[in-house]
């Protein structure tokens, strides 16, 4: 099944719903970074959340960055998504390992630890919007839910899942986000809470070949659900030699000259796809000349 996101509404527009399958995306991240199963689950949940959150982006060049920083052994998680749901991400410690938690599941909360979540929305304006919340669990889904409630004042329910098999290969990944819009009553809140608690984990449903549409149907069929859109999502890094050149130039002339004198060149490494770019002395001298011309 291809990766995609479904958008829906229910109960006369008072419920906004998103559901996604992201299995291929998470498999690609696992392959690109050589992730341990625990790191795969942690990054996969975060990428799935970001993919669904990208559906709110209207501007073509807009991006959302999720930064999770904790005191656990994974160190941190960074995910970036654009308005086309092209997702890229990495964890600081890709080989993190912990014993299973008391429920027999990967201990994402233990790997993340105590810390914070930043949601940075760059909409092409003068300054990006930055939402900052403390982590409430480190399990990712609960932290996304808390972010929406605290920073955007939108009551939200979030479910995120990554399922691996005995050989530590990703079997399924995906999630859903349900949000209450103005006009939703207490009965609607109770209905959603009961529905969510009554269905299996989202990764289990996807492994059973349930589609995102099927999952939303299970949750909202009694509330006149309407599918309003479907769009692809994928793991894609947009790094390039030109982008790396711009990054090097931000270091300034003195630091670039130091690279030339000490190493006779420089290697730039993309954290999102692990691609490496080599810049020779001649390349760096050319960048220095560009910097000098910009100052004159």
Curated annotation (Swiss-Prot):
Lineage: Bacteria, Bacillati, Bacillota, Clostridia, Eubacteriales
Biological processes, Gene Ontology terms: protein refolding
Protein name: 33 kDa chaperonin
SS bond list: 237-239, 270-273
Keywords from the named record: Chaperone, Cytoplasm, Disulfide bond, Redox-active center, Zinc
UniProt gene name: hslO
Main location: cytoplasm
Protein purpose: Redox regulated molecular chaperone. Protects both thermally unfolding and oxidatively damaged proteins from irreversible aggregation. Plays an important role in the bacterial defense system toward oxidative stress.
Compartment annotation: Cytoplasm
Post-translational modification: Under oxidizing conditions two disulfide bonds are formed involving the reactive cysteines. Under reducing conditions zinc is bound to the reactive cysteines and the protein is inactive.
Cellular component, GO annotation: cytoplasm
Cross-referenced HAMAP family: HslO
InterPro entries tied to this protein: Heat_shock_Hsp33 (IPR000397), Heat_shock_Hsp33_C (IPR016154), Heat_shock_Hsp33_N (IPR016153)
Keyword check for Secreted: no
One annotated GO molecular function: unfolded protein binding
Pfam families: HSP33
């Amino acid at each position: 099944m291809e990766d995609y996101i479904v958008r829906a509404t229910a109960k006369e527009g008072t419920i906004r719903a998103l559901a996604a399958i992201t299995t291929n995306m998470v498999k690609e991240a696992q392959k690109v970074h050589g992730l341990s199963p625990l790191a795969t689950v942690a990054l996969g949940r975060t990428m799935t959340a970001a993919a669904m959150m990208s559906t709110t982006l209207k501007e073509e060049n807009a991006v959302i960055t999720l930064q999770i920083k904790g005191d656990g052994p994974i160190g941190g998680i960074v995910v970036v998504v654009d308005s086309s749901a092209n997702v890229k991400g990495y964890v600081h410690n890709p080989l993190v390992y912990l014993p299973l938690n008391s429920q027999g599941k990967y201990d994402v909360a233990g790997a993340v630890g105590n810390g914070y979540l930043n949601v940075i929305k760059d909409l092409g304006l003068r300054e990006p919007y930055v939402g900052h919340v403390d982590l409430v669990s480190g399990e990712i889904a609960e932290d996304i839910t808390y972010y929406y409630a605290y920073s955007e004042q939108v009551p939200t329910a979030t479910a995120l899942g990554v399922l691996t098999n005995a050989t530590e290969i990703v079997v399924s990944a995906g999630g859903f986000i349900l949000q209450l819009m103005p006009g939703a009553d207490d009965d609607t809140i109770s209905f959603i809470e009961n529905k969510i608690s009554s269905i299996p984990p989202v990764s289990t449903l996807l492994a059973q070949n349930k589609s995102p549409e099927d999952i939303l149907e299970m949750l909202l069929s009694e509330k006149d659900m309407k599918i309003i859109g479907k769009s692809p999502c994928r793991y894609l890094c947009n790094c390039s030699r030109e982008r790396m050149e711009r990054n090097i130039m931000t270091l300034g002339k003195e630091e670039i000259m130091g690279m030339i004198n000490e190493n006779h060149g420089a290697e730039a490494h993309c954290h999102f796809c692990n691609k490496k770019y080599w810049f020779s002395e001649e390349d760096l001298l050319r960048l220095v000349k560009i910097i000098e011309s910009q100052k004159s």
